[in-house]
């Protein structure tokens, strides 16, 4: 709740309202169309739209940053790793701002509903592979999931989530422990010595996943489940992973740009 209070103060300072930058839609009057018969005997109708077509600015107002020329395209490439570190622009870090600028498509809604049902123990697919072309919204969809299940969201501030909850058969958002694995951000040659795991060194992507989950769950001692495998540079067995996930559950593991990670370790001895 404290984090959301700080976010609300930031939104009020930046946009003048705790509800954020939701643009007010100006509904233009219906477009007028002049219709006339070209000839009495051919039955052809001619339409004159031209001068009666309203400007797009009269139909929909752009966000203030776009209207004022403050929009920088480079800042708005979705970066899941950046958001998980608490970095990047507020429009991605703040759940209220993120969902205010996100149109929830039917495909995204289906993903969110399926995931919420799984996390809340109501079925749902345990593994979902997002298949879209470049720029198709995979990272954006994962960001939506990330914000939804980490806790601290006030649904009354995000109207677009209410239909999602209803479809999932839930009254409130379930909370999960989240691990974010982004191939472009991970460095397979660099080991990690987390302060909360003084006895261990994180060496592999499996170790990174376990480290994030046990940290989120507040159970750092559980890292011992995968520590031997991580130290030897091999993947944990299925029983070890099952024990880890059950002990830290419910869990959400988001994996993005794994091809980039595979390229880093291809042909490198010891990796």
Question: Model segments located where?
Answer:
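Long, highly charged low-complexity segments enriched in Glu/Asp and Lys/Arg with interspersed Ser/Thr
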Residues: 2-23
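Walker A/P-loop-proximal flanking segment of P-loop NTPase domains
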Residues: 25-136, 143, 149
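P-loop NTPase motor core
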Residues: 99, 128-133, 140-239
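Structural motif corresponding to the C-terminal cap of alpha-helices
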Residues: 115-123, 153, 213, 217, ...
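Generic recognition of flexible, low-complexity loop/linker segments
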Residues: 116-119, 166-169, 239-244, 249
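Short loop/turn elements that form and flank the Walker-type P-loop nucleotide-binding site
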Residues: 123-124, 174-175, 247-249
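Conserved P-loop NTPase "ATPase switch" module shared by AAA+ and STAND
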Residues: 245-271
